[in-house]
Amino acid sequence: LLIWTALDIRHGRAGLPRGLGFGALAVVAVTILAGALVAGMDAGLLYNEYPLMGSGLVPVEYGDDGVMDAFENPASAQFHHRWIAVLAMLTVLAFGLRAMRHHTSRLPGMLAMMMVLVQFGLGITVLLQGVPVSLGGLHQAGAVVLLGLTLWTVHRFPA
């Protein structure tokens, strides 16, 4: 909300996000929330490989905790974060490509696309390295930067 207000002051009031812009913002926000669950459960320590989680794409523990599985099972939390992150990357890339067609959103669109690729690669690196605190913190900071760049892009090109 603070970033959006700052953008309103700097560039004038923008319409509410809609369409692919809303989708990009929503999936980035959900990815951050899923990442918070991973961090809170130390779920990144379970499967330090990518794209597989043990012997397959889905961990063997998936669904063990029933209805609360997403919130109580570290393996499921990591699984969800991985695949929501893939969706976030694809959505931000699609929205960024669309935003780059308009002169007012070209720069933020390009930066958001670059950042989503950096963030995705950093997430995999953090996992493969066994989640060192320095890289984990950098990955969390990257999430904030990605959210800010996505907000900026949506503000300049809300469709």
Q: Model segments located where?
A:
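Polytopic transmembrane helical bundles with strong interfacial aromatic enrichment
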Residues: 1-159
